[in-house]
Amino acid sequence: MSEKTFLVEIGTEELPPKALRSLAESFAANFTAELDNAGLAHGNVEWFAAPRRLALKVANLAESQPDREVEKRGPAIAQAFDAEGKPSKAAEGWARGCGITVDQAERLKTDKGEWLLYRAHVKGESTEALVPNMVVTSLAKLPIPKLMRWGASDVHFVRPVHTVTLLLGDKVIPATILGIQSDRVIRGHRFMGEPEFTIDSAEQYPQILLERGKVIADYEARKAKIKADAEEAARKIGGNADLSESLLEEVASLVEWPVVLTAKFEEKFLAVPAEALVYTMKGDQKYFPVYDNAGKLLPNFIFVANIESKDPTQIISGNEKVVRPRLADAEFFFNTDRKKRLEDHLPRLQTVLFQQQLGTLRDKTDRIQALAGWIAGQIGADVNHATRAGLLSKCDLMTNMVFEFTDTQGVMGMHYARHDGEAEDVAVALNEQYQPRFAGDDLPSNPVACALAIADKMDTLAGIFGIGQHPKGDKDPFALRRAALGVLRIIVEKNLNLDLQTLTEEAARLYGDKLTNANVVDDVIDFMLGRFRAWYQDEGYTVDTIQAVLARRPTRPADFDARMKAVSHFRTLEEASALAAANKRVSNILAKATEPLNDIVHASVLKEAAEIELARHLVVLRDKLQPYFADGRYQEALIELAALRAPVDEFFENVMVNAEEKDIRINRLTLLSKLRELFLQVADISLLQ
């Protein structure tokens, strides 16, 4: 069977830069699945993405599906014909479905009887016939939140489509996709190269687009070029470019022919906090800031043009003129804001609503102030500083700088607090209260900041759950999942002695009578334990390990983490599977027991050597392990409990639990309950698979 290279390119208006990669990757994944489902043999599926195109190139694509033999078994002969030998309705219906008559059917004889049988040799469909619908289906499944239509057409796509190139080898596959007739026409760069040209074969892509169209269609190659050229440009001016992955991806999605240039701004702007300057350079202008080797911002920036200019100084000058007013605004806001103390903004917080039922930002500030102080007392942080940080926590939201550059919230609070002479840990806490903002983000660096960050998040969790507006499906407008995971990460990774039960109770208490959900505390804790499940799964822990710990519902996150590590280690022990099975057996036996058990195991009632030996081990371990449990040394405890494998095996091998004599039976059930209680001090290992 012959194989050819296949190419599909969808030429569009400028695609959303932040979605470009996901669109291309989804297109490739969808189309690959279509090929596999159709049984079309193929080689590597390579995707290409640039601002005005999505493309796929498939190596070694078979020109048709393989032929296949089809067999369909029909009714048994006894049901296929009546007493007179005439075909039954069932037989005729089956034959019609196969496209034959009953007389044309073969017969299949087996040891179990005889059936009608249809056999056919089905010729595989051509790739040319199959591919158009595959492309249409793959495009329809792209993750596009909002479609648009253009002109008089009722076709919908993420952006207007101008060209559809569909080639199998050197042949155009005729099709109409997104309202456009397929062809071999490709559009080049808007201002460089050839604006439009034809491609002779799929093999020529993307090289022909590079040479004639001045477009680097390979997304990763374009991104790598920007990164390398920006690093070199920064090195030439004695600095290091801030090439954050997200901005690098966005810029790579904005240009077809990247040209890296260096520009500068007045040094006077460096008196403004670097974060504000960086925010406007990266967020508004898509520029890469440059730092010296000490990490200090330089009065330079790197940007990427989408054209090779005969006079690059004009482009550089233009970008400098664009950024200058933005930096001047930041300078003005900074100087204006410093004329007031942070504390002076407190009254204005009363004018901003946090949530309709939960009050204003000033109300939230008062709660955070109290809760941060309470948390500080629990974890050994400075209570006065935590309380002060809570009071000032939202004041920077009322400043000109944060109003204009919203992402500088927190960090500007820190700078203004330092200007006001606040304690350093208070100032730092104002910046770090929102950490961690995302998975893998840094945690607050000092105890006061930890107290404030936890207080802010717990206040939101208690409040929103308290009015019954918990997250549903993908909707989480108050980012409660992120808040819950942030609290857990801080407590676990900083090893803070906090209990979710008392923490949530205190957060809910501070709302007074505003909360309508009587189960708010349990609901918040259950939600946070659910976040634990997701976190540990991401960390590579098995589901049954997580379930074993969750069954005990530990509400101290640091304690939960210690149990997780202990059970995970226990699973590696040779005795683990046998003891897990034994615990499951014990759990089932106790669940079926209907008689009340004894408080203790009565040694005088023990008869068999195996039960006497098991009881002896339990007494020794119970006394030995109490300090382990009290100190959270769960891993050591489970290692000790692993020694019970032999006596437990002996017990089940030689002892009849449900003895006829009631006192013996109840004593043995009590013995098993004591065994189970020891393991349950750590986790329910009966849930381990």
From Swiss-Prot:
Belongs to the class-II aminoacyl-tRNA synthetase family. Its main location: cytoplasm. Tetramer of two alpha and two beta subunits. Its EC number is 6.1.1.14. The gene is glyS. The keyword Aminoacyl-tRNA synthetase applies. One of its GO terms (cellular component) is cytosol. One of its GO terms (molecular function) is ATP binding. Pfam families: DALR_1 (PF05746), tRNA_synt_2f (PF02092). It catalyses: tRNA(Gly) + glycine + ATP = glycyl-tRNA(Gly) + AMP + diphosphate. HAMAP family: Gly_tRNA_synth_beta. Keywords: Aminoacyl-tRNA synthetase, ATP-binding, Cytoplasm, Ligase, Nucleotide-binding, Protein biosynthesis. InterPro entries: DALR_anticod-bd, Gly-tRNA-synth_bsu, Gly-tRNA-synth_heterodimer. GO terms for biological process: arginyl-tRNA aminoacylation; glycyl-tRNA aminoacylation. It comes from the Bacteria. This is Glycine--tRNA ligase beta subunit. PROSITE patterns: AA_TRNA_LIGASE_II_GLYAB.
